[in-house]
């Protein structure tokens, strides 16, 4: 029963879409009507500016952290953290109050991975960041990150690995059109290194 309760707690907190709250409260708009129509960090940052993208990301990380800590202290057994993570992703990607139309779960999955196993989480996140810089793409690296993390955790605990693999599949589903765009050459390129250099005032040769 603990696994079910952990999943439900995660789902309830996952339903709090920071992008929608920020959009309605501060910008007086519906984020799903702009850009990629995705109520997530990337779309908020791309359409309304980095400040709102960062605020959205922080909000999503905070809701995830609260849910994970509740499960951590209430239900013994590390495996329950994985189920809370599954609930968070389900709630974030398929919120019941928004007709099951939510975000893609990148920030949430990163938070869950680091909370569950911070060493493996940070290591796979680093790989994803390097891939992002090399590929100049925001679609494939998050999926590679979650896949690598899932495989590693499967070696440690098969049940946890399967739960994280389900999370990976949910993300693949949410990213499906972006994946198609990437492999057909229509994916949006994001030069992270250029953005960092520009922010620091470093001129490219």
From Swiss-Prot:
<feature type="transmembrane region" description="Helical">
    <location>
        <begin position="7"/>
        <end position="27"/>
    </location>
</feature>
<feature type="transmembrane region" description="Helical">
    <location>
        <begin position="160"/>
        <end position="180"/>
    </location>
</feature>
<feature type="transmembrane region" description="Helical">
    <location>
        <begin position="78"/>
        <end position="100"/>
    </location>
</feature>
<feature type="transmembrane region" description="Helical">
    <location>
        <begin position="125"/>
        <end position="145"/>
    </location>
</feature>
<dbReference type="InterPro" id="IPR003811">
    <property type="entry name" value="G3P_acylTferase_PlsY"/>
</dbReference>
<dbReference type="Pfam" id="PF02660">
    <property type="entry name" value="G3P_acyltransf"/>
</dbReference>
<comment type="subunit">
    <text>Probably interacts with PlsX.</text>
</comment>
<dbReference type="GO" id="GO:0008654">
    <property type="term" value="P:phospholipid biosynthetic process"/>
</dbReference>
<protein>
    <recommendedName>
        <fullName>Glycerol-3-phosphate acyltransferase 1</fullName>
        <ecNumber>2.3.1.275</ecNumber>
    </recommendedName>
</protein>
<comment type="function">
    <text>Catalyzes the transfer of an acyl group from acyl-phosphate (acyl-PO(4)) to glycerol-3-phosphate (G3P) to form lysophosphatidic acid (LPA). This enzyme utilizes acyl-phosphate as fatty acyl donor, but not acyl-CoA or acyl-ACP.</text>
</comment>
<keyword id="KW-0594">Phospholipid biosynthesis</keyword>
<keyword id="KW-0812">Transmembrane</keyword>
<keyword id="KW-0444">Lipid biosynthesis</keyword>
<keyword id="KW-1133">Transmembrane helix</keyword>
<keyword id="KW-0808">Transferase</keyword>
<dbReference type="GO" id="GO:0043772">
    <property type="term" value="F:acyl-phosphate glycerol-3-phosphate acyltransferase activity"/>
</dbReference>
<keyword id="KW-0443">Lipid metabolism</keyword>
<comment type="similarity">
    <text>Belongs to the PlsY family.</text>
</comment>
<dbReference type="GO" id="GO:0005886">
    <property type="term" value="C:plasma membrane"/>
</dbReference>
<keyword id="KW-1003">Cell membrane</keyword>
<keyword id="KW-0472">Membrane</keyword>
<feature type="transmembrane region" description="Helical">
    <location>
        <begin position="52"/>
        <end position="74"/>
    </location>
</feature>
<keyword id="KW-1208">Phospholipid metabolism</keyword>
<comment type="pathway">
    <text>Lipid metabolism; phospholipid metabolism.</text>
</comment>
């Amino acid at each position: 029963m603990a696994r079910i309760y952990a999943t439900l707690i995660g789902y309830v907190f996952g339903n709090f879409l920071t992008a929608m709250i920020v959009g309605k409260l501060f910008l007086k708009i519906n984020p799903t009507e702009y850009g990629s129509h995705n109520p997530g960090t990337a779309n908020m940052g791309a359409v309304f500016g980095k400040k709102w993208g960062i605020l959205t990301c922080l909000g999503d990380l905070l809701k995830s952290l609260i849910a994970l800590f509740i499960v951590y202290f209430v239900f013994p057994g590390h495996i329950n953290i994985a189920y809370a993570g599954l609930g968070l992703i389900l709630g974030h990607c398929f919120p019941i109050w928004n007709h099951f139309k939510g975000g893609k779960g990148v920030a949430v999955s990163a938070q869950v991975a680091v909370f569950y196993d911070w060493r493996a989480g940070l290591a796979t996140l680093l790989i994803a960041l390097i891939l992002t810089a090399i590929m100049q793409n925001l679609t494939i690296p998050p999926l590679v990150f979650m896949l690598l993390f899932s495989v590693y955790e499967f070696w440690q605990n098969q049940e946890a690995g399967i739960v994280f693999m389900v999370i990976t599949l949910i993300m693949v589903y949410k990213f499906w059109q972006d994946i198609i765009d990437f492999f057909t050459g229509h994916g949006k390129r994001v030069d992270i290194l250029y953005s960092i250099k520009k922010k620091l005032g470093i001129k490219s040769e």
